Amino acid sequence: MALCPEAKGHAWGIALLDITTGEFFVTLAEHDQNLENLLSEIARYRPAECIIPSTVSEALIRKFSGTGVVLSRFRDEAFSYVHARKTLTTHFHSASLSAFGCEDEPAAIGAAGAALLYAQETQNSSLAHISTLATRASSQSMMLDAVTLRNLEVKESIRGGTKGATLFSALDLTKTPM
């Protein structure tokens, strides 16, 4: 996961990249005073690692401390619109990003470009299987905050934080797809 604050401060660009499956998508989290929207997105996807621009303040980083996600600082230019757009268009062999639906979202492009560049620099294998970038709108799905996810025991049990007695583990035992 990569997070890129919008220059005007109205939203955060969020990119999620799974290098094992090639799934790659971006979304936006509207800015709010306590970062609840952003923290809900982090709780929703539970990434192993989250990269952020190196200039993000320590006060802001402290807000992420309860998420359990490893935060890694990455150089600021990777998140810039121009650099990120070049990284993405080069990787996808495309002249523009309009086909991906995110051309007009600089924060989303910044996050996606930084995530892809970070993967290119840290992985010793080809990333050719990452063949598309999807754009997801938060308004197209129901959002459950971290407290609701915990109380419903979707991915983690309330008793000890184990993964054994959860909705996800029960569905994982089914023999047929739903």
Range-by-range predicted roles:
Residues M1-M178:
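Charged catalytic and DNA/RNA-contacting regions of genome-maintenance
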